[in-house]
Curated annotation (Swiss-Prot):
It comes from the Bacteria. GO terms for cellular component: plasma membrane. It holds the Pfam family OAD_beta. It is found in: Cell membrane. It catalyses: N(6)-carboxybiotinyl-L-lysyl-[protein] + n Na(+)(in) + H(+) = N(6)-biotinyl-L-lysyl-[protein] + n Na(+)(out) + CO2. GO terms for biological process: sodium ion transport. Its main location: membrane. Its EC number is 7.2.4.1. Keywords: Cell membrane, Membrane, Translocase, Transmembrane, Transmembrane helix. It is a multi-pass membrane protein. This is Carboxybiotin decarboxylase.
Length: 401
């Protein structure tokens, strides 16, 4: 029997661990398979779901007996903080250096923001600023509503604020905020945030169809806008970066990363732009998905606060989606029907996913209607508003403490 346990330690641990943990491991292995498969089918976002699903499978399947009979893996241990233990683990766990040097300090979030900035077009923010701002503000409804609900449900203000940032649908922002506001809940918040952000890919089209009648979904919008010069966009990015860093220094790492990406694009520094748009963006997204999957250990998922975060996370994204579409309707009414209310969903700043969802939903009703540029503008504005909301949360809580 001992020889069999030595030959197949991963299977053996299923019988030696607490039955609840063993069952959870099996459930997570199955769940990881479905995440990766639905990523393959493009039902969910493949860039995150395929590596996340495989990471989830490996971390829960590849459990073995370590020193002194301790059960664990040689992938990653996010709970270690003792320096001497951490140094030893970095020589054993292959993902430990990646986690500690890029994930737990928010660096990976900043790298992703570099790429988002380099791929963002701010022309439509400058051409129609009020339309983008109104949509973006309403799309933050979920963030502020969930903060209040979270506190009412027993979370501490800092914990509720960290969970509430899921409502902005901005993954890197959620990582950054939860690290500062609620480090002990960082892992479950990050996992749930990215799971839900990928689920918006599948769920938001139904929300749009529920809130926007068919005859309005195919509305064409005027696309004959004046051209915005690269100089104007460059100057805007520099001034916006300066102003937001002055007002919200706690969020300045993400603000700098995003606007530097825009500035590099508008200055046409092609070597940097190619680096940010391809190598850094896709490399960081790969490790982000893989690490999120590797963090889905059974012990982590069994945290009693997980169920509350699950409920609050989906509440935040649902209210934000409703708020965004409501903002779209308000702009439609004020513009006397010259704005497609579906664009409102793009104010939920999961770039570029929500903008693509908006365009796809409109195309189903009218193949000739093009709203993607306006939707991207609303999404970029939503990202900026999300950064402001996060900065306000962090600054206010620091002041209260």
């Amino acid at each position: 029997m001992e020889q069999l346990m030595s030959l197949f330690p991963a299977i053996s641990t299923l019988f030696t661990q607490d039955p609840v943990i063993s069952i959870t491991r099996i459930a997570l292995i199955i769940f990881g398979f479905f995440l990766s498969y639905f990523g393959f089918k493009r039902t969910l976002e493949p860039l995150i779901m395929v590596p996340m699903g495989l990471g989830m499978i490996a971390i829960n399947a590849g459990v073995l007996f370590l020193e002194a009979g301790v059960v664990g893996t040689i992938h990653l241990d996010p709970l270690v903080s003792e320096p001497s233990v951490l140094v030893n683990l970095m020589q054993v766990n292959w993902l430990q250096p990646v986690y500690n040097f890029t994930f737990s300090n928010g660096l990976i979030a900043c790298i992703v923001f570099f790429g988002i900035g380099a791929m963002s077009d701010i022309s439509f923010i400058l051409i129609r600023p009020w339309a983008s701002i109104i949509v973006a503000l309403f799309a933050e409804m979920g963030t502020f509503a969930t903060l209040i609900i979270g506190i009412k449900m027993g979370l501490l203000p800092n914990e509720a604020a960290a969970v509430a940032t899921i409502g902005g649908a901005d993954g890197p922002m959620v990582l950054f905020a939860s690290l500062i506001l609620a480090k002990d809940l960082f892992v479950p918040i990050a996992i749930i945030a990215y799971l839900y952000l990928s689920l918006t890919y599948a769920g938001y089209p139904y929300l749009i169809k529920l809130l926007v009648p068919k005859k309005y979904r195919g509305l064409e919008v005027e696309m004959d806008f004046p051209e915005v010069s690269q100089r104007s966009k460059f100057v805007f990015s520099v001034l916006a970066c300066m102003l937001l860093c002055l007002l919200l220094p706690v969020a300045s790492p993400l603000i700098l990363s995003f606007f530097l990406g825009i500035a590099i694009k508008e200055a046409q520094i092609e070597p940097f732009q190619n680096l940010l748009e391809t190598t850094l963006t896709y490399g960081s997204t790969l490790f982000l998905g893989l690490l999120l999957g590797a963090l889905c250990e059974a012990k982590t998922i069994l945290d009693p606060k997980i169920s509350l975060i699950v409920v609050l996370g989906i509440t935040a994204l649902l209210i934000s989606g409703i708020g965004g579409v409501l903002g779209g309707w308000i702009v439609y009414w004020f513009s006397k029907g010259k704005f497609n209310p579906v664009i409102g969903i793009a104010g939920v700043s999961c770039l570029p996913t929500t903008a693509k969802i908006a365009q796809k939903t409109v195309t189903e009703e009218n193949p000739y209607a093009v709203i993607l540029p306006l939707a991207m503008g609303a999404g970029v504005c939503g990202l900026i508003v999300s950064a402001i909301a996060t900065g306000v949360f962090i600054s206010t809580l620091f002041l209260l403490n």
